[in-house]
Amino acid sequence: MGNDAEAAVLRISGGEELIAARGGSRALDPKSGHRLELLTERKIKDKALDMLEAAAVPGRIELSMFYLADRDIVRALLDAKQRGCEVRVILDPSKDAFGRTKNGVPNRQTAARLVKKEIPLRWAATHGEQFHVKMLYVELDNDLATLLLGSGNFTRRNLDNFNAECDLAFTAPLGHEVMVRARDTFERWWNNADGEIHTADYTVYEDRSVLRRISAWMKETTGLSSF
């Protein structure tokens, strides 16, 4: 799949033919519960939705994201919360992006919707930099979990085949080192462990502006946005 994705980009850009990598590959043993997937654009969204739909009840769902605006994914998070999953979200406050000052769109508007339905949410405590993480951790049945991370923001622009994106989805038992580190990292950020300030309370960047809510909706709907 990796070669196919790279070959597609080369065709679009008029590049030379891709040289196939030499050497063998080793497949993960499906009986062990391990699975590794390389996903691009729309397939990232499909995987995220599948993960959220398959989440164990009760089970942990932990999302760390730079931009969150895709309506299907937001709905899936709300549905998972309603089913009894333990959902927590850390978002960039959308106040800085690539050296420019922003007005909070789209994350503060999305956050308001999540918090209204009692999903705990914290902001990355940024100081001019960006919380450029795109990571979704979901616990499944049979003591398994899937970790999805890479370049794709959870927005229409990134997930509906308008921008070249690439993510990895890794499924393994809950006790696998990767899953343990993913949970520990999220907990450290969430709780500001060891005196380090990683996140801030929701109220710090809460935004009740109706105009900005409409703006966020229009930008996500039309695609006329930077996210």
Predicted regions and their residues:
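DNA replication sliding-clamp ring fold and its partner-interaction surfaces
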Residues: G2, K45, L49, E53-P58, ...
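Active-site cores of enzymes that catalyze phosphoryl transfer or operate on phosphate-rich substrates
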Residues: M1-A48
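Short amphipathic alpha-helical segments, especially helix-boundary/capping motifs
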Residues: R22-R26, D50-E53, E86, A111
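Short, contiguous clusters of charged residues that form electrostatic/catalytic patches at enzyme active sites
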Residues: K43-D50, R71, R75
